[in-house]
């Protein structure tokens, strides 16, 4: 007989920024246990599912999540008691129905996701399987190429570049373990380069360095220098990936690049990126344009979509309806996958499958406010996503995911494949 949900208990814990978030523990009828904690973003898309916060200024500056915790411990607990744990789709549908709003505003996406993931972990334990195998039991798995966010700017750091993330991707590695080593060596090399320039080497929310560089181009230049000093070839062993988080730069129909003293139209921003792609070994640009600049996105995809991965994060917010439109209108060629943008495991998996079925890539991602939860590592492997974005190789909430992937690769042995540049299967 399949195990059913016996109990669920949620609590308020802290994320890596010292803000409260929701954690849930699930126990099944056969004694199996599952735990999950929910992350939180700093630059959030306006179309994301609602993260329920208390708004009580006397506690945690209004950022408490007691309402979401109470929703799990009362309404959700009552609804899922006795529910078959292995029916993930059914469970998530029940949560969506119970919430009854289009954006999960009643129960909170944080309450719903903690429940959804904790049940999945418990169900995997009940089957005596690691989570990745429980989600997709197959003969061979693809380990993800990591996007290491080694230089932070924008909303993830103060006094830094306009653009939020400058990343490196070790496509030339033969295994995930080697990719992790390469990325880490570049990270330490970057620290030395920055120190040599008398630059600040404190780290931002995601573990990347947050120096005060005069322009956005300087960030790319120092990373190229760091790659070479670590003994690697930019554009061969290691490529650059960017997340400018352009919605944060957009106001009144224009993009403002404060460090460059520039105000650009949508068409000019597209040309700006085309210029960068010509000049630097850039393989991926995430949120290169404002989340509702559909015409700009289509223009960018038309111009460079065959040679650069164009990832929609705030643009799609892991939402199938927005993704469907993006596919139909050829607005990009990739989607960023964040569990808490949509609020259930089933909807997240559906978004990955929809992207893959349209020959789009899907990049599984953390948030800037993370916990020690490693679900996304298992999800990336289970879905054979081929790419993961989970910060710098620094700060325990980031390295927890990388270390989980190391263990998975070791466990799989010859059944694990590291895709390298093949992760970008839709580029020419």
From Swiss-Prot:
Is Cytoplasm one of the keywords?
yes
Tell me which domain of life the UniProt entry assigns to the organism this sequence originates from: Bacteria
List each coiled-coil range.
none
Please provide one cellular component term from the Gene Ontology annotations of this protein.
phosphopyruvate hydratase complex
Positions contributing to Mg(2+) binding: 243, 286, 313
The active site consists of 206 (proton donor), 338 (proton acceptor)
GO biological process: what's one of them? glycolytic process
Q: Which NCBIfam families match?
A: eno
The similarity comment for this entry is: Belongs to the enolase family.
Query: What is this protein identified as?
Result: Enolase
Species this protein is from: Dehalococcoides mccartyi (strain ATCC BAA-2266 / KCTC 15142 / 195)
């Amino acid at each position: 007989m399949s195990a059913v949900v016996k109990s669920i208990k949620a609590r308020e814990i802290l994320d890596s920024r010292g803000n409260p978030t929701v954690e849930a523990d699930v126990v099944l009828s056969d004694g199996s246990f599952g735990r999950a904690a929910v992350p939180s973003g700093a630059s959030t898309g306006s179309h994301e599912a609602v993260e329920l916060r208390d708004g009580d200024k006397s506690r945690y500056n209004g950022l408490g999540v007691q309402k979401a915790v109470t929703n799990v411990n009362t309404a959700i607990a009552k609804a899922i008691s006795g529910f078959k744990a292995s029916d993930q789709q059914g469970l998530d549908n029940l949560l969506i129905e119970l919430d009854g709003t289009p954006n999960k505003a009643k129960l909170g996406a944080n309450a719903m996701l903690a429940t959804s993931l904790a049940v999945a972990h418990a169900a995997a334990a009940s089957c005596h399987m690691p989570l990745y195998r429980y989600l997709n039991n197959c003969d061979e798995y693809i380990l993800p190429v990591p996007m290491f966010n080694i230089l932070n700017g924008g909303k993830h750091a103060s006094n830094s570049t306009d653009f939020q993330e400058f990343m490196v991707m070790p496509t030339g590695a033969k295994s995930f373990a080697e990719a992790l080593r390469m990325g880490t060596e570049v990270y330490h090399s970057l620290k030395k380069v920055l120190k040599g320039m008398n630059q600040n080497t404190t780290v931002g929310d995601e573990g990347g360095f947050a120096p005060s560089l005069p322009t956005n181009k300087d960030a790319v230049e120092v990373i190229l220098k760091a790659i070479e000093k670590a003994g690697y070839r930019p554009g061969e062993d290691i490529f650059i990936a960017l997340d400018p988080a352009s919605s944060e730069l957009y106001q009144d129909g224009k993009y403002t690049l404060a460090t460059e003293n520039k105000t650009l139209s949508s068409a000019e921003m597209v040309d700006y990126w085309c210029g960068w792609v010509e000049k630097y070994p850039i393989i991926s640009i995430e949120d290169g344009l404002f989340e509702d600049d559909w015409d700009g996105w289509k223009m960018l995809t038309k111009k460079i979509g065959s040679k650069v991965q164009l990832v929609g994060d705030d643009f799609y917010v892991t939402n199938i309806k927005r993704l469907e439109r993006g596919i139909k209108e050829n607005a990009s060629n990739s989607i960023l996958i964040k569990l808490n943008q949509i609020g259930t495991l089933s909807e997240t998996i559906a978004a990955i499958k929809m992207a893959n079925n349209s020959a789009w890539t899907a990049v599984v991602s953390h948030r800037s406010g993370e916990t020690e939860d490693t679900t996304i590592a298992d999800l990336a492997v289970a879905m054979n996503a081929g790419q993961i974005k989970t910060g710098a190789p620094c700060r325990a909430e980031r390295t927890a995911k990388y270390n989980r992937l190391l263990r998975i690769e070791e466990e799989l042995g010859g059944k694990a494949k590291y895709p390298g540049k093949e992760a970008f299967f839709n580029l020419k």
